[in-house]
Curated annotation (Swiss-Prot):
Taxonomic path: Bacteria, Bacillati, Actinomycetota, Actinomycetes, Propionibacteriales
Cleavable signal peptide: none
Location relative to the cell: Cytoplasm
Family, similarity comment: Belongs to the methyltransferase superfamily. RNA methyltransferase RsmG family.
Gene designation: rsmG
Name of the protein in question: Ribosomal RNA small subunit methyltransferase G
GO molecular function: rRNA (guanine-N7-)-methyltransferase activity
Primary localization class, coarse: cytoplasm
Keyword S-adenosyl-L-methionine applies: yes
Region annotation (Disordered) ranges: 224-250
Protein's job: Specifically methylates the N7 position of guanine in position 518 of 16S rRNA.
């Protein structure tokens, strides 16, 4: 990974010192530098986003950390540039985070970031979410602007433990997404989603997320079969065929 850092790399805002612990803030700073440098060069972050890396990307992703249980296992689907997965690993060193991303150029960047930051509890997995169905389960499955909720359920819920949760970062249309996902929520046996608004206590623009859990955890078993659609065929979750690359720092 190069040391070429954009001149537009934003300075650390005061609120970041309230979001990240003192011994983790330097890692967050370095991640911002990597996003502003190689992240922009490789097309993972738009150049116009560079001045907003802290407030629009790192801080709002870090707010999600307060919703994750202690020492939880986390799968971040469609991790892309590591948002929110890498940020969660920085903010919460107690977590075990798996970054799930199908594109090689993105997983290469993620592997380099993980090594650079010494995040030894982070796994980079080049795969689609469906490739993990039937083989892996997590306490929390996260995503950020990956897909509408109705489609996201089919990728995420087969990975969620009986007492776990899907935790998806969403935008202002979250209520409409929940309404549209009503039939899928019922088919998968999910409880009514909970909408979270985070960051107001820090004076930040609200970060919106939706939490989805199983309606009856006691009835969840594996491998989870995709619920039958009317007039369709039932599909059973397959076994993982992704490539795992665990990178450890020095």
């Amino acid at each position: 990974m190069t040391d070429d850092v954009s001149r537009e790399t934003p300075s650390v805002p005061d609120v970041a010192r309230r979001v990240f612990a003192s011994d983790r803030l330097s890692l967050a700073e370095r991640f911002v530098e990597l996003l502003a440098g190689d992240g922009v060069v490789r097309g993972l972050i738009g150049p116009r986003e560079t001045p907003r890396l802290w407030d629009r990307h790192l801080l709002n992703c870090a707010l999600l950390a307060q919703q994750v249980p202690l020492e939880a296992t986390v799968a971040d689907l469609g991790s892309g540039a590591g948002l929110p997965g890498v940020v969660l690993a920085i903010a919460r060193p107690d977590l075990r985070v798996t970054l799930v991303e199908p594109l090689l150029r993105r997983t290469t960047f993620l592997e380099e970031v993980v090594a650079e930051l010494g995040l030894d509890r982070v796994e980079v997995l080049r795969a689609r979410a469906e490739a993990l169905h039937g083989d892996r389960r997590f306490a929390v499955v996260t995503s950020r602007a990956l897909a509408p909720l109705d489609r996201l359920l089919g990728w995420s819920m087969p990975l969620v433990e009986p007492t776990g949760a899907l935790l998806a970062m969403k935008g202002s249309a979250v209520a409409e997404e929940i309404t549209a996902a009503g039939p899928e929520l019922a088919r998968w046996g999910c409880a009514t989603p909970e909408v979270l608004s985070l960051g107001a206590d820090l004076g930040l623009a609200p970060t919106v997320a939706v939490r989805v859990v199983w309606a009856d955890p006691g009835r969840v078993s594996w491998p989870i079969a995709a619920p039958r659609k009317r007039g369709g065929q039932q599909r059973r979750a397959g076994h993982a065929r992704g490539t795992s690359n665990r990178r450890r720092g020095t």
